[in-house]
């Protein structure tokens, strides 16, 4: 799914998600970050996927891609970098 959504940035996205959550859609951090890409609730609310669960793998990946594009194709929102 990550390759389908991120296209040419798929490998980098896999690296980020692997580091952030171990590719676990059920991952949760005490900070409130959730899902495959460990997206914070406030950031999640600003995506088109806000009505879905952040633990839905596909929704989390789509939201992460939106954040990535919104930020100028930057991984700045994430602790882990490709």
Q: PLM features: what roles do these ranges have?
A:
Residues 42-44, 52-82:
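Compact alpha-helical subdomains of small soluble proteins
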Residues 31-48:
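Substrate-binding/active-site groove segments that recognize
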Residues 17-21, 39-42, 81:
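Active-site-proximal beta-strand/loop segments in catalytic clefts of secreted hydrolases
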Residues 25, 47-51:
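Short amphipathic alpha-helical interaction patches enriched in hydrophobic/aromatic residues
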Residues 5-10, 28-33, 53-61:
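Solvent-exposed, acidic/flexible segments
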Residues 21-28, 71-77:
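Secretory-pathway/luminal and periplasmic proteins that interact with or process carbohydrate-rich
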Residues 1-23:
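Export/targeting segments at the very N-terminus of extracytoplasmic proteins
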């Amino acid at each position: 799914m990550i390759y389908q959504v991120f296209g040419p940035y798929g490998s980098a996205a896999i690296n980020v998600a692997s580091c952030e959550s171990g590719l676990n859609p059920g991952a949760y951090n005490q900070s409130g970050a959730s899902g495959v890409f460990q997206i914070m609730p406030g950031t999640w609310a600003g995506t088109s996927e806000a009505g879905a669960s952040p633990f839905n793998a596909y929704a989390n990946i789509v939201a992460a891609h939106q954040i990535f594009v919104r930020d100028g194709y930057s991984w700045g929102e994430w602790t882990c970098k490709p």
